[in-house]
Amino acid sequence: MDDDGLLLNFAAPDSNASSKSSAQKPVKVSGGRWKDRRKLQLSLSGRGRNKRAETGVNKESIAQPRDFSSSKPQSFREEQLAKRPKYFESRGEGGKNETYVSSLFTSNTKSKLENEKVEEEKTYLPSNAPMKGADDFNGLGLNDNLVHHLTESLRFKNPTQIQKSVIPSLLSTSRDLFVKAQTGSGKTLSFLLPILHKLMQEKKNPITRESGVFAIVLVPTRELANQIYGVLETLTRCHHQIVPGIVIGGEKKKSEKARIRKGVNILVATPGRLADHIENTTSLDLSQLRYLILDEGDRLIDLGFEETITKITDTITRCSRISESTQKWQGLPTKRVNVLCSATMENNVEKLGSIILNNPEQISIDTSKSREGDEIDSKSMAPAQLTQRVVVVPAKLRLVTLSAVLKEVAKTAPTSSTEIVRTIVFFSCSDSVNFHYEAFKRNGSEFRKARNAETNRFEMVTVGEDEANAEGSDTEIPKISSAPTISANSVVYKLHGSLTQQVRTSTLQSFVQAVPFDNSENNYNHLILLCTDVASRGLDLPNISSVVEYDPPFSVQDHLHRIGRTARLGNKGSSYLFLLPGIEEGYVDGKIRVVHPEGSIRITNYETILQNAFGDSSEIKKSDPKSKQGKWDMHATTWHLDIERWLLEDAASHESAKQAFTSHIRAYATHLSSEKTFFNVKTLHLGHLAKSFGLREPPKKLGSLATKSSSTRKEYGEKSRKLEDPRKKMLRMAKLAASSASSEFNY
């Protein structure tokens, strides 16, 4: 039988089936923890979890890099590699104590403002200069002795435009005045001269110090009060019967009471201290007050003195007895004349004017017109002869660029020791002033004012280390030191509201007065004042060649008052405004261009400033033709690294730098809401900004260190302070509260 095509089927046992049957049987595991036994039991039964590969947001394995070869052509990959930067900043764990050393010239944001090429520099006639060819002070109707003293002793030749407008008005009428004029135009003399003229004209019943107070000048800051008082002392030398006086916060009230008790005719005061004397000094007689002058009215409002001023004026009105003495002093006004001086006519100033002034006469010399032809009445203008330079600097390069600007100004200082060049640098907070003062005076000598026994003249003598560290020196000796990190001929000062009044006054006097230094090796003829806005209002500082706004102003009016310290009374001047790349660049066209004459703003490249300051002209590509001229970038980097190493070695200076950094951020966040478009704290690169303070720590660590002072002291090996005795602390706080109860806003 043929069996071809016959198929036989055999049922063989399936191995999978046998395994399934065996797997269905539970596996018993004993010993160990329950969790471990359960995991082992599940794994043996085939029910364990499958480990998934770790993936990123694009579902690609993190362990294996993505392969671009299949999706992108070779030419595209080569093009992308060519676009990559050659240098990268370290983003690892950092060095010792988690610090980072980054390059100054990498990862910087570039400026979008183009450097303006000026083919022919425009020249403007000075807008605040004395009027040449106009009538002199004799033509204004002033007292002959006063005019002779002005022209012969004080060397005033011609009045300014604002003086020519205000003086005749105060002499002829008794109307209240609202005076608006740009800074540096001579407003102080415009209201002091008519008052002195009226008091000097009383021949029948001469004015003496016992006659009472006839004029009060209210000012916002103590420095401005001291300056006006100094001008009054100079003017009254031609008529000793008229006695000026001053009452300001920070001085001893007992001494002020004694001066008031002896008699004062013209009183210069700050609002808080004057209100205190009105309440507590019975010898202060304001019944014959004829003139009330409010200088820098906009600043008085900004500092919150509106309520205090209203209270002062109400008290003066209530105790006035002018009607009883009109026959005795017939040349004086028959009612009180109020004068409000301000750089702007904003709403808050107009509100103060409506409270203080009664049917006032408005005098303004600002007739500038905008580009559209509309007259600008609400804003003051910068002096026409001022050159405004805008420097857009990356955050990391701010400190080294500031030193370069000061080096450049120091090079322009004359070689003669009699000619002195002065520069003012404005900061946003006092902590920043302290840090930069310590940074610039590093390895320098401190000075103080002393009388030479041989010549009987004052000069600046070197302060010894023991004297500088002596107890009480911080409250008595002004902060003056040489600045070898800038130049051999530079001297640096510091001024802010946290200093005592004695130090503030002596610092300003030393900065203004040309006192020779006892060190004959160096010709210290470049004086640098590091300050806050406490020195931006009304101060008439001579020979200010340059003003540097290192931190942007908080308003356009602050900008005008800052730059108004230079280019005064027709003299030329220059100012620098530091801005960061990005949204801050819009501040030029958005805010300040309208208050500057057309063509007076210069966009300056920071690299050009660094090249001029750190480039060595004697080394011009001698051996290496590829090297930059003078290797200015290497010199700038070395200068900045020296600052960083100094902070690492000096724990106190390092703490000062951290405090300055955090205070700078807080101050930056307080810009007006109308300017948040240009100054937004959220757009700051805090790491790069910390670099400009010489810090190597990341900002997050700086913030944590600022809140942990005890750990900071342990880290740098400082001894922890002993707890203060509760009784001594209570007495100290009571004395502090008593001394500051009537003091001014610590600005």
UniProtKB/Swiss-Prot annotation:
* Start-end of Basic and acidic residues biased regions: 75-96, 111-123, 712-728
Subcellular locations according to the entry: Nucleus, Nucleolus
User: Where in this chain does the record put each Helicase ATP-binding domain?
Assistant: 168-363
Q: What class of enzyme is it?
A: hydrolase
Tell me which CDD domains the record gives.
SF2_C_DEAD (cd18787)
Helicase C-terminal domain residues are 401-626
Stated EC number for the protein is: 3.6.4.13
Q: Which keywords fit this entry according to its UniProt record?
A: ATP-binding, Helicase, Hydrolase, Nucleotide-binding, Nucleus, Ribosome biogenesis, RNA-binding, rRNA processing
Its catalytic activity? ATP + H2O = ADP + phosphate + H(+)
Q: Which GO terms describe its biological process?
A: rRNA processing
**Any GO MF annotation of the entry:** ATP hydrolysis activity
As annotated in the record, motif DEAD box runs over 295-298
The region called Disordered is annotated at 1-102, 111-130, 700-729
What coarse category fits the chief subcellular location reported for this protein? nucleus
Q: Known PANTHER family for this protein?
A: RNA HELICASE
- What is the stated purpose of this protein? ATP-binding RNA helicase involved in the biogenesis of 60S ribosomal subunits and is required for the normal formation of 25S and 5.8S rRNAs.
- Protein family per UniProt: Belongs to the DEAD box helicase family. DDX31/DBP7 subfamily.
Q: What other note does the entry give for this protein?
A: Present with 1460 molecules/cell in log phase SD medium.
What does the entry note on its domains?
Answer: The Q motif is unique to and characteristic of the DEAD box family of RNA helicases and controls ATP binding and hydrolysis.
Question: Any idea what this protein is called?
Answer: ATP-dependent RNA helicase DBP7
